[in-house]
Amino acid sequence: MFVDQVKIYVKGGDGGNGMVAYRREKYVPKGGPAGGDGGKGADVVFVVEEGLRTLMDFRYQRHFKADRGQHGMSKGQHGRKSEDLIVKVPPGTVVKDEKTGQILADLVTHGQTAVIAKGGRGGRGNSRFATATNPAPEIAENGEPGQERDVILELKVLADVGLVGFPSVGKSTLLSVVSSARPKIAEYHFTTIVPNLGVVETGDNRSFVMADLPGLIEGAHAGVGLGHQFLRHIERTRVIVHVIDMSGLEGRDPYEDYVTINNELKEYNLRLTERPQVVVANKMDMPDAEENLQAFKEKVGDEVKIFPISAVTKQGVRDLLFEVANLLETTPEFPIHEVADESDTSVMYKLETEGVKFDITRESDGTFVISGYDIEKTFKMTDFSRDESVRRFARQMRGMGIDEALRARGAKDGDIVKILEYEFEFID
């Protein structure tokens, strides 16, 4: 089964927790702090595997959660970083964040990698919090939560040339006679329901990959007739070969077919019109084909170069292949996506107080609910079993401006404040 789009969940490993520990040393309060830092959580890394051809495996496994880092230990020993979770994908896979629509990676070459969900850093042990006024702190951090997201995987076939046109115009037959590909061919519409690839050799030491794409119909750009699934595979091609049935046996007008297909390409992705297009008048061995071709030429004008062929008899096919090979030599690749830059520019352990974003809402029972990435991360990294950690969290909330914002919303002593699933009292 050919699967070219799936939604999956990925989560980087949480960082390991820092440790509160002390060493035994004479004249040093409590022996001095000796708690180690937690190890970094594992990343979720996508790797291109050239042997894969479809996203079928993701139909059965849709959750990928990397391991957390090892916790810090006594004697100042830091936890070990966990090994990254490797997820293999086929060449041509585009990874998109479902929530934002951002393109996270465009994976095309064997061995190419991309970090899709970063692991969290390890929490600091108590030795990191020692100061002149507090030489033996009873405080350590929990590990930072790993990044988590839902992502859409789209497979867009890697081909130099894409065959487009209405169903049953002869695309599959053409591919079968110019390459060793053996697509399914029959006298009914939508025989081809998945892309078929074939390597074409021109006879003068040139070759290229051609894709027979499923037939398009009017409204394909809006998803009619599985149009989105079909059209996405054209995006990587450098040359479009537009196959038109000149026989008239289907009762359609060749010129109307030509206009309709080009409109669908334009509506789906305007950049598809930048690619050179070779117009192929197929089925020229049929009785009315010559007359239909003349009428077609009158409507499109002299600017459109047309290659009359018969895929069945191979008439005109050689000239067509040479034209396509010539175009490929002068046509650059078209980048189909601008990949988002998610490089980590944060400074470890530095609390940024400017621009901290959070939301405060109020439930029907009067509970204040605080949400936002920074406060939720800080909350998760706090060890609430230790009083010093609780006091530090209170200072961090004040530093973020949350206390002041709660007062502005009318919060008073004893009001309930909620972060994630935890509730506590507001003390002014």
UniProtKB/Swiss-Prot annotation:
Keywords attached to this entry: Cytoplasm, GTP-binding, Hydrolase, Magnesium, Metal-binding, Nucleotide-binding
Annotated residues for binding of Mg(2+): S172, T192
Transmembrane segments: none
MF terms (GO), sorted A to Z: GTP binding; GTPase activity; magnesium ion binding
Any single biological process term in GO: ribosome biogenesis
Cofactor: Mg(2+)
Keyword GTP-binding: yes
EC number: 3.6.5.-
Keyword S-adenosyl-L-methionine attributed: no
Domain OCT: 350-428
PROSITE patterns given in the database record: G_OBG, GTP1_OBG, OBG, OCT
Residues annotated as domain Obg: 1-158
Primary site of residence: cytoplasm
Function in brief: An essential GTPase which binds GTP, GDP and possibly (p)ppGpp with moderate affinity, with high nucleotide exchange rates and a fairly low GTP hydrolysis rate. Plays a role in control of the cell cycle, stress response, ribosome biogenesis and in those bacteria that undergo differentiation, in morphogenesis control.
Name listed for the protein in its UniProt record: GTPase Obg
Species in which this protein is naturally found: Bacillus cereus (strain Q1)
Organismal lineage: Bacteria, Bacillati, Bacillota, Bacilli, Bacillales
